A protein has these predicted regions:
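A short, well-ordered alpha-helix in the C-terminal region of glycosyltransferases
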Residues: 275, 355, 362, 369-384, ...
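Short hydrophobic beta-strand element within catalytic cores of glycosyltransferases
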Residues: 301, 318, 323, 327-330
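Conserved acidic donor-binding segment of nucleotide-sugar-dependent glycosyltransferases
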Residues: 339-353, 362-368
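Acidic donor-binding loop of glycosyltransferase active sites
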Residues: 292-310, 326
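A conserved mid-protein helix/loop that constitutes part of the nucleotide-sugar donor-binding site
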Residues: 17, 218, 222-241, 247, ...
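Carbohydrate-associated surface elements
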Residues: 177, 198
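Nucleotide-activated donor-binding/catalytic signature segment of Leloir-type glycosyltransferases, i.e.
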Residues: 261-286, 293, 297
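N-terminal subdomain of nucleotide-sugar transferases
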Residues: 1-64, 115-118, 144
Length: 399
């Protein structure tokens, strides 16, 4: 099968690391793969994505060549293009309309490009926003099937979701919450399918219940960009509670983002600079290597539901931590309970520093409980989130 994957920026930039295992699985399974990023900008951050570069069609979002090809395609198929434009003009507000119009020329260019090379058998977009807009336009012009993976923020945006669901073969949602939202927005049931994201799990087993030296601080990692939805502010308050009660703990914050400075100020004001480190942006391969090497005793994700409804999907960072045998503490928000249930992690209410502190104290002091939790977590990820299981199921949906 010849598959075109449309991404936001992968293999470029630091985001969309979760797409890499699925694209590589399709390639290793013998399928012909091309990747088309909307914006082919930035450095190649993730080592695993280097292998995808030779299969990437790198073009800007807009250029004279793309505009020229779009005009030629419009002249060639004026009725089809007009129908697509009418559909695009159903966008529910001006912002979304402008976003869709911005990608329209590249979608027409892509159709023309494939017609001059090899037309794919299927187009699959990651995100049901503008990536799916390109997929819908290109697939319509080429008269081939297409599908999309929907996540969380892109669903909340509601960029022509009803129209896209009606037009595509299927919508793959990464969790039940997202699937229910799209069913409500589209009125469709049969096309909406839940298939979790898959992570690449090494064959070797982690050393569950690693023994740490009591005199050393309990080492905790929080992986996540500094955004309101991640709930950093509540975790810092929880760390202060633990330190005030004599706990020996050190927190590593991995990531960047607009709220980093305010979190740094919070750490300084609470006199926690000796107990909290800012690691910056870690590459995906570096993060995985350190997880499997036992660099951290626990991974925590204190995510919240923001005032505008932003929330977590099923965080890949938690899947990978659980696969590596690292105990997890998280909040019961978004899609997290789908992953972290039935004794696989400690879940606490959102925006509750005291509950976070109590959960972290449990992980620090109850080794036997942590080992049981880590074993159950690894089984959960192996059975339900392994790319070796998810990869073939996604490809089967496309055929």
């Amino acid at each position: 099968m010849n598959v075109c994957f449309i991404t936001r920026s992968m293999p470029f930039g630091k985001f969309e690391a979760f797409v890499i295992p699925e694209v590589l699985y399709a390639k290793k399974a013998g399928h012909c793969v091309t990747v088309v990023p909307l914006r082919a900008e930035g450095e190649v951050i993730h080592q695993d994505s280097v292998e995808i570069l030779n299969h990437t069609i790198k073009r800007p979002l807009l250029s004279p060549a793309i505009v020229g090809a779009a005009i030629q395609e419009t002249v060639k198929q004026p009725i089809a293009v007009l129908k697509l434009l009418r559909k695009i003009f159903r966008s529910r507000n001006t912002t979304i309309l402008l976003q869709n119009m911005a990608v329209f020329p590249k979608a027409l260019w892509l159709a023309r490009y494939y017609r001059s090379t090899v037309i794919p058998d299927h187009i699959h977009a990651y995100w049901i926003s503008t990536a799916a807009t390109i997929a819908m336009i290109t697939a319509t012009i080429l008269q081939i099937p297409w599908s999309v993976t929907a996540h969380r923020g892109d669903i909340a945006m509601n960029n022509l979701i009803a129209e896209k669901v009606a037009d595509c073969c299927f919508v793959r949602c990464i969790n039940e919450n997202g699937a229910n939202e799209i069913r409500q927005l589209s009125g469709e049931i049969d096309k909406i399918r839940v298939l979790h994201l898959g992570v690449d799990i090494p064959e070797s087993s982690p050393n569950l219940g690693r023994m740490r030296q009591p005199e050393k601080p309990f080492h905790v990692l929080m992986p996540g960009n500094f955004a309101a939805v991640k709930g950093h502010v509540y975790l810092i308050q929880a760390i202060k509670i633990i330190i005030n009660n004599g706990g020996n703990l050190h927190l590593d914050l991995a990531g960047e983002g607009e709220l980093r400075q305010s979190i740094q100020q919070q750490v300084d004001s609470l006199q926690l600079t000796e107990h909290v480190s800012f690691l910056g942006e870690l590459s995906h391969s570096s993060l995985l290597a350190q997880l499997w090497a036992g660099q951290w005793d626990c991974v925590v994700l204190p995510s919240i539901v923001t005032a505008d409804g932003a929330k977590e999907g099923i965080p890949v960072s938690l899947m990978e931590s659980m696969a590596a045998g690292v105990p997890v503490v998280a909040t019961a928000t978004g899609g997290i309970p789908e992953l972290c249930s039935d004794g696989t992690a400690l879940l606490v209410p959102e925006q509750d520093p005291l509950a976070l502190a109590e959960a972290l104290n449990t992980v620090m002091n109850d080794t036997e409980k942590c080992v049981r939790m880590a074993i159950l977590a690894q089984i959960r990820v192996q059975e339900e989130f392994n790319i070796k299981t998810i990869g073939p199921r996604l490809l089967d949906m496309m055929t």
